[in-house]
């Protein structure tokens, strides 16, 4: 079976990752001891994508938990599903990265990375046919960003033909807990552009807006934000975990979603976003789901898709519904908003349907968009980066760990290149075709 090895790094990565395992264990009816209590073959049919089966019919997550300080991992271990993880797969240091990318990537993290790779090897060897890796981390801190990207490049070296997929939480000025976030994020993006196949950009700002506006929560906690992230991660991985009509694996997803290797940063979305109390009262219709799913307010990245164009889109519908209706609605959206889809990739919308809805909902939809509007997110980080870097503010924390200013300059220009590549494809052919049409019309008049 096609297995995935899951890695969670740093405080944010471990919190999101921990939540992800709670949600999918729940969907597959696996309790906190790893025992299956469900009654549906569908739940077990592809269980080994994410779980190893141990003696005594225990299911153990194929997860590796990494951090440079023990705190967060202790709280995962003492949490509701803490006992389900394999004890050997907790790998942690004592020093912490102090929100410093250089510590995570070059000094503290580099010392721990070999023991993580040993566990990665052990998990990979136990796989029948490994399809790839997924990493949950944030880009604003030190461990998830610095050590996370170090792990990615090391794993890439050792498994060059396996898919590397990340769920990356991008920092935002509205929800900031460190002043050096723009540095850490830019240095990380520099790595992600080169070394991952698919990156889901999750943005705290967007998550806060959803909690405020849509869910009407007055004081959203990180718990509420992580709840949204885990719903999205569960949706995105549905096709990998359940048999469906369109059986996706990580590679098929990449083939459908990534038209140019560097442009693999996706904007996730989820529907229905209803406050936790009111969701049972009425089931949404397929048109409503489709409408909501494409709505800018439902995007987990703080970018407005109406400011750009979609290169590719994947939608995953969950629940019992008519395939025909889903296809009609998806076509309907594309036809009505055709200017927001690039015309030089025909049929750039792919849809999958899975019969099993998430807990507590009759049906749901998850959205994955590769939109040129994601450049807004990189621009935002880049502006903050430049503001500080121009004055060399805080730079001594990084050079003190042996980094060179040159690396900052390279990362900055790589990110700016990424932005202009998105811009280039956003404008592609629309203008050229426009000029071309006029010539033709001119020819027609004669």
From Swiss-Prot:
Name listed for the protein in its UniProt record: Tubulin beta-2 chain
Residues that bind Mg(2+): 69
Keyword Cell division: no
Gene3D superfamilies recorded: Helix hairpin bin, Tubulin/FtsZ, C-terminal domain, Tubulin/FtsZ, GTPase domain
Biased composition (Acidic residues): 429-446
Organism of derivation: Drosophila erecta (Fruit fly)
List of residues binding GTP: 11, 69, 138, 142-144, 204, 226
GO molecular function: GTP binding; GTPase activity; metal ion binding; structural constituent of cytoskeleton
Sequence similarity: Belongs to the tubulin family.
Cofactor(s) listed in the protein's UniProt record: Mg(2+)
Subunit structure: Dimer of alpha and beta chains. A typical microtubule is a hollow water-filled tube with an outer diameter of 25 nm and an inner diameter of 15 nM. Alpha-beta heterodimers associate head-to-tail to form protofilaments running lengthwise along the microtubule wall with the beta-tubulin subunit facing the microtubule plus end conferring a structural polarity. Microtubules usually have 13 protofilaments but different protofilament numbers can be found in some organisms and specialized cells.
Disordered: annotated span: 424-446
Keyword flag Secreted: no
Pfam families per record: Tubulin (PF00091), Tubulin_C (PF03953)
Gene: betaTub85D
PROSITE patterns documented for this protein: TUBULIN, TUBULIN_B_AUTOREG
Alphabetized UniProt keyword annotations: Cytoplasm, Cytoskeleton, GTP-binding, Magnesium, Metal-binding, Microtubule, Nucleotide-binding
Function of the protein: Tubulin is the major constituent of microtubules, a cylinder consisting of laterally associated linear protofilaments composed of alpha- and beta-tubulin heterodimers. Microtubules grow by the addition of GTP-tubulin dimers to the microtubule end, where a stabilizing cap forms. Below the cap, tubulin dimers are in GDP-bound state, owing to GTPase activity of alpha-tubulin.
GO terms under biological process: microtubule-based process; salivary gland morphogenesis
CDD domains hit by this protein: beta_tubulin
């Amino acid at each position: 079976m096609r297995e995935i090895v899951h890695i969670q790094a740093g405080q944010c990565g471990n919190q999101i990752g921990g939540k992800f395992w709670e949600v999918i264990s729940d969907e597959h009816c696996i309790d906190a001891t790893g025992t299956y209590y469900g009654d549906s073959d569908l739940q077990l049919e592809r269980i080994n994508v994410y779980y190893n089966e141990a003696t005594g019919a225990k299911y153990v997550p194929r997860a590796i938990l990494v951090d440079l300080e023990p705190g967060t991992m202790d709280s995962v271990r003492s949490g509701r599903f803490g006992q389900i993880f394999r004890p050997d797969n907790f790998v942690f240091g004592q020093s912490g990265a102090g929100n410093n990318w250089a510590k995570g990537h070059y000094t503290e993290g580099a010392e721990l990375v070999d023991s993580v790779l040993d566990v990665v090897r052990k998990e990979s060897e136990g796989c029948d046919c490994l399809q790839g890796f997924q990493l949950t981390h944030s880009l604003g801190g030190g461990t998830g960003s610095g050590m996370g990207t170090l792990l990615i490049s090391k794993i890439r070296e050792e498994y060059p033909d396996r898919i590397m997929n990340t769920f990356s939480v991008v920092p935002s000025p509205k929800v900031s807990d460190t002043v050096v976030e723009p540095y850490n994020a830019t240095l990380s993006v520099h790595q992600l552009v080169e070394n991952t196949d698919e990156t889901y950009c999750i943005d705290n700002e967007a998550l806060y807006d959803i909690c405020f506006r849509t869910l009407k929560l007055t004081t959203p906690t990180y718990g509420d934000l992580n709840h949204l992230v885990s719903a999205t991660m569960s949706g995105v991985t549905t096709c990998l975990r359940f048999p469906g009509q369109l059986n996706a694996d990580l590679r098929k997803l990449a083939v459908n979603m990534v038209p140019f290797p560097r442009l693999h940063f996706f904007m996730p979305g989820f529907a229905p976003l209803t406050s936790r109390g009111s969701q049972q009262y009425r089931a949404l219709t397929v048109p409503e789901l489709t409408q909501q799913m494409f709505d800018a307010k439902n995007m987990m990245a703080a970018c407005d898709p109406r400011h750009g164009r979609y290169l590719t889109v994947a939608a995953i519908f969950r629940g019992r519904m008519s395939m025909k209706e889903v296809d009609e609605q998806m076509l309907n959206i594309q036809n009505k908003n055709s200017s927001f889809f690039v015309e030089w990739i025909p049929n750039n919308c792919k849809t999958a349907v899975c019969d099993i809805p998430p807990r507590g909902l009759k049906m749901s939809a998850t959205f994955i968009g590769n939109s040129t509007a994601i450049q807004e997110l990189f621009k935002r980080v880049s502006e903050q980066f430049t503001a500080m870097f121009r004055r060399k503010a805080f730079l001594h924390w990084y050079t003190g760990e042996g980094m060179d200013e040159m690396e900052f300059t390279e990362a900055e220009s790589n990110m700016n290149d990424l932005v202009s590549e998105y811009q280039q494809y956003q404008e592609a052919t629309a203008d050229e075709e426009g000029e071309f049409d006029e010539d033709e019309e001119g020819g027609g008049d004669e």
